[in-house]
Amino acid sequence: MNFIINSPLEQFTTRVYFGLSSGLINLDTITLTSFSIYSIAVVALILGFSILNDNNTNILPTRWSLAFESLYFTVEKMVSEQIGGLEGRLLFPFMFSLFMYILIANVVSLVPYSYAINAQLIWTIGLSVAIWIGCTLTGLANHGAKFFGLFLPSGTNLPLVPVLVIIELLSYIARALSLGLRLGSNILAGHLLLVILAGLILNFISISIFTFALGILPLSILLGIVALESAIAFIQAIVFTILTCSYIKDAIHLH
């Protein structure tokens, strides 16, 4: 196992730390990678956050409780407005878990030299494709052939039907990629910007004492970008969850 990081860009590289092998059975596919380690860490942080939120023995809520409840009610309002009804209540645990996983993974990746889970496009696109397939199967199971009416807006003139059906169909298929691509590309671009700027600033302040003193200005700019990336981490989790709710709503209510 090699835990030494030689380059900041290695936060985007999936590394294998441990693997099982046997002369009788091929176990090479059973490996412990940086992706799995950070995924376990993210889940552990979510569970720890939930435990800290346990406010049953306190009269006044703690800061952790207020923060967790704010996130909880934000997602609950989102699901009730987008989906609503019994379906919304049944799907809320999934939507809240999805939101928390993306949010915590984004925040963890802001730690210098940490692994950026959501910068892996194969993961984010794979997640969005799985959600898209689930929404499509839900729509077909609930509505049968009527589900295809989603591709034909009501009141469409007959000559425009073929064109609009093709456009709506392509737009629907693009959801499978756009949902994950939006998340992955935003996280990847933001982290690359931080890595490049941090490297340039480090080289600049290492030249002399004079440049070290001048480095206060670019360092303040870098801190501002870090704050911006922190906001983007939250916004991307919100956007991913809202769009997932919207896709599920289309599958359930056909509008």
From Swiss-Prot:
The chain crosses the membrane at residues 32-52, 91-111, 121-141, 159-200, 219-251. SUPFAM superfamilies: F1F0 ATP synthase subunit A. It is found in: Mitochondrion inner membrane. F-type ATP synthases have 2 components, the catalytic core F(1) and the membrane-embedded component F(0), linked together by a central stalk and a peripheral stalk. The central stalk, also called rotor shaft, is often seen as part of F(1). The peripheral stalk is seen as part of F(0). F(0) contains the membrane channel next to the rotor. F-type ATP synthases form dimers but each monomer functions independently in ATP generation. Keywords: ATP synthesis, CF(0), Hydrogen ion transport, Ion transport, Membrane, Mitochondrion, Mitochondrion inner membrane, Transmembrane, Transmembrane helix, Transport. Mitochondrial membrane ATP synthase (F(1)F(0) ATP synthase or Complex V) produces ATP from ADP in the presence of a proton gradient across the membrane which is generated by electron transport complexes of the respiratory chain. F-type ATP synthases consist of two structural domains, F(1) - containing the extramembraneous catalytic core, and F(0) - containing the membrane proton channel, linked together by a central stalk and a peripheral stalk. GO terms for cellular component: mitochondrial inner membrane; proton-transporting ATP synthase complex. Its main location: mitochondrion. Residues 1-6 form a propeptide. This is ATP synthase subunit a. InterPro entries: ATP_synth_F0_asu, ATP_synth_F0_asu_AS, ATP_synth_F0_asu_bact/mt, F0_ATP_A_sf.
